[in-house]
């Protein structure tokens, strides 16, 4: 019984420690944090939300399920190379970017989405909806379908 109680306590503290590790990281003059896979991570991101002016959310189109391991590239409106590149370990990303217009590309399962957003004093929320499977007909190009099938 003591072993089970100790294991449960250690698991609870491990989850809390993981949530506390989420903090804003710096890259190319932008600060960002991604996560939200569990309750603790979502709470940690909620505490960081006031620091962000871009909020990204990655979901499945049909069911609205959360996605993780999404490749994200943020481009300033006048740039051809990304000012920020990250892999979102969870369904949410918070970004503190200099004021301006941005193009944000997200790639998941071979499907790529590109949306525009303006970073101002008020946060802009950008939702990327991906098909359950890239070949299920939700805006997946023939190239995306072939790539997802491994051809």
Task: List the model feature ranges, each with a label.
Residues 90-96:
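Short, surface-exposed beta-strand/beta-hairpin micro-motifs centered on an aromatic residue
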Residues 6-7, 17:
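Cleavable N-terminal signal peptides
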Residues 71-83:
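Short amphipathic beta-strand segments in non-cytosolic proteins
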């Amino acid at each position: 019984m003591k072993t089970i109680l100790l294991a449960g306590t250690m698991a609870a503290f491990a989850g809390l420690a993981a949530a506390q590790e989420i903090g804003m990281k710096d890259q190319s003059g932008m600060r960002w944090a991604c996560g939200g896979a569990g309750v603790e991570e979502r709470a940690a991101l909620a505490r960081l939300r006031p620091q962000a002016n871009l909020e990204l959310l990655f979901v499945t189109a049909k069911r609205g399920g959360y996605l993780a391991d999404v490749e994200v590239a943020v481009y300033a409106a006048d740039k051809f190379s990304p000012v920020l590149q990250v892999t979102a370990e969870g369904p949410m990303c918070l970004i503190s970017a200099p004021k301006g217009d941005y193009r944000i590309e997200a790639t998941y399962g071979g499907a790529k989405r590109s949306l525009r957003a303006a970073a101002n004093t008020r946060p802009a929320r950008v939702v990327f909806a991906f098909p359950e499977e890239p070949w299920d007909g939700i805006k997946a190009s023939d190239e995306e379908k072939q790539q997802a099938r491994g051809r």
